[in-house]
């Protein structure tokens, strides 16, 4: 038994993600900028 909403979600999700990949402006800056995360101390 399949939920009738599931196929719709499977179709909408890839379209949404593709739009984010194509339009780089939609990504927040902290996902785009280069950062050295290996030398940062999370306790400070």
UniProtKB/Swiss-Prot annotation:
Protein name, UniProt field: Unknown protein 9
Organism taxonomic ancestry: Eukaryota, Viridiplantae, Streptophyta, Embryophyta, Tracheophyta
